[in-house]
Amino acid sequence: MIGYTTIGVKNLDAAKTFYTKLFDAEVLVDVGRLAMIGQTTDQPMVAVCEPFNGEAPSVGNGNMIAFPGGSKENVDKMYEKAIALGASCDGEPGQRIEDVFYGAYVKDPDGNKLCFFDFS
C-alpha cells in the first residue's frame, strides 16, 4: 500500500550513504535535492531530500517510520547496523507487547525516529 516515505535531511550525501547501507539498497532515483532509495521502484522506498523551501529540516513531533525486520534476530541486526552507521538509540531491541510485538528504536543522524519491528 505504501509507495515511499520522504525524510527531510541536512546532508543529502550522508543520508544516501546511511540509508543505502542500512537497507543494503541502491539510490534508484537521484534528482539533485532528492534521492529515492530501495531495491526496485515497484517496492516501497525511502526518499531523502533537502526541503523544497530551503529551510532546515525538522523532525515531526510524534512521527516515526517503521520498517519490518522479519524476525527478532533481524530487528536486532538492523538496530545494530543503524547504530554503527551513526544513529542514536531511542529504545533498545525488546518485546514491547507480550507475544505480539518486538521492536527497536533509533534516531537517524538527522534526528528522524525509526522503528524496526516484528510481530512476534
Give the predicted meaning of each segment.
Residues 26-60, 114-118:
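Conserved short beta-strand elements that form part of the metal-binding/catalytic scaffold
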Residues 1, 58-62, 98:
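Short glycine-enriched loop/turn motifs at secondary-structure junctions
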Residues 14-16, 72-77:
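Short, conserved charged micro-motifs
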Residues 1-16, 65, 120:
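N-terminal beta-strand motif that seeds the catalytic metal site of vicinal oxygen chelate
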Residues 6, 45, 66, 103-104:
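Short hydrophobic/aromatic beta-strand element in the GNAT-like acyltransferase core
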Residues 79-120:
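Vicinal oxygen chelate
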Residues 21-28, 87-88:
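Conserved acetyl-CoA-binding loop of GNAT-fold acetyltransferases
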Residues 12-22, 104, 113:
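Conserved active-site alpha-helix within GNAT-family acetyltransferase domains
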